[in-house]
């Protein structure tokens, strides 16, 4: 990271930033064409290892790319605001407040029914705040649960 003064390394603060993000964008390489998909998500972190879960249709371009090229980039951000420094009316005196996370990892389709249930529960918890969810097997089998195992991730903020 070029701007070390903006780097966030505290795991508690990183978790706070992730918890306030509502969308994670995954970028795929589709034979030289970048394909970016915005997704709602849930996650778990253990010992500075992050795993994100998403859900979606069982067929389509995203699913095809997961099978074809599972190494992806991802991005999420929150608290974005553009403002003038010291009330200036000069274009170059504007800046942006933000918190963001970028990284790369490996995506896969979850096949284990219990891990699918866990992934869906994490997605719902992140988006609603409610921890306990019941999913019958028919519901679980109707969707793809996608797992992103993070290889590298950085967090940055500017106030």
Tell me what each language-model feature is.
Residues 1-19:
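Extreme N-terminal tail/first-helix region
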Residues 2-3, 81-159:
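Charged, gly/pro-rich active-site loop segments
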Residues 61-85, 92-93:
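Helix-adjacent hinge/juxtasegments
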Residues 51-53, 73, 147, 154:
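General beta-strand recognition
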